[in-house]
A protein has these predicted regions:
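Coupling/switch segment of ABC-type P-loop NTPase heads
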Residues: 51-129
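Short beta-strand
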Residues: 133-138
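Switch/communication elements of ASCE P-loop NTPase nucleotide-binding domains
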Residues: 1-51, 139-234
Length: 234
């Protein structure tokens, strides 16, 4: 994508009939605003426009709830009990829809499909968290397991800390060269400030290395880098 790139959007739920003009000046654009100011709705509208313009399979949107349906294995959400070892991410049909899935499941499917993405994410997990990751298919369903690098014991992704799931989701989307436009709602969710700074560096690197357009919304100062007044656009 060439910059500056201007989008004209209508977010009726937030701005009524008023047309909003948004200009992307580089490969990384950051939306900052108070709660309920319309950041998420604006991201979703941009998602729809980008999918229409360049193709649905070139655009990836990551929800702020990247844990998705994994949450019912982590927290009591109804009267039923769920065993983490039974957690599956989906079948081959779900995998084919990975770029439309807005939670971390889509990124685990990307790691299964693209071994280059798997290798890059695995290397960083080992360094950052002392973790190995394993992706297996069982009776037509994909399962993900983790284990410490100094142990042979494994456990389900549903039992892993949410910070790892969030980091993996974002890293896999950044490294997936199929994705030309990546929109991330609140990438800082569950992350320590040091990890937020690390992910910001990875985003900037991916924008340059893969010519990727990345748009994020955030409340975190760690996700905002201003070196000069000219970087504060409109």
């Amino acid at each position: 994508m060439e910059y500056p790139h201007t989008l004209h959007i209508n977010v009726e739920k937030i701005f009524g009939n008023q047309e909003v003009q948004i200009t992307l000046y580089s490969g990384l654009t950051t939306f900052v605003g108070t709660n309920a100011s319309g950041k998420t709705q604006t991201l979703k509208k941009i998602r729809d426009i980008m999918r229409s313009n360049i193709g649905a399979n070139k655009v990836r949107y990551l929800s702020s709830n990247r844990i998705g349906n994994m949450e019912q294995y982590r927290s009591k959400t109804n009267q039923y009990n769920y065993t983490t070892d039974d957690y599956t991410l989906g079948d081959q049909a779900t995998k084919r829809a990975r770029l439309q899935i807005e939670t971390a499941s889509g990124d685990f499917f990307a790691m299964d499909e693209r071994k280059d993405v798997f290798i890059k994410v695995s290397e960083r997990l080992s360094v950052l968290f002392n973790r190995n990751i394993f992706i297996r298919w069982d009776a037509g369903q994909m399962k993900v397991f983790f284990g410490k690098t100094d142990s042979e014991q494994e456990y389900s992704v549903a039992a892993e800390a949410s910070v790892l799931v969030n980091v993996i989701s974002i890293l896999a989307a950044l490294f997936d060269e199929v994705v030309e436009v990546l929109l991330i709602d609140e990438p800082e969710v569950s992350l320590h400030p040091q990890l937020q700074s690390y992910l910001l560096r990875e985003m900037k690197s991916a924008a340059k290395r893969y010519n990727k357009t990345i748009i994020i919304s955030t409340h975190s100062a760690e996700m905002i880098e201003l070196n000069s007044a000219s970087e504060l656009c409109n």
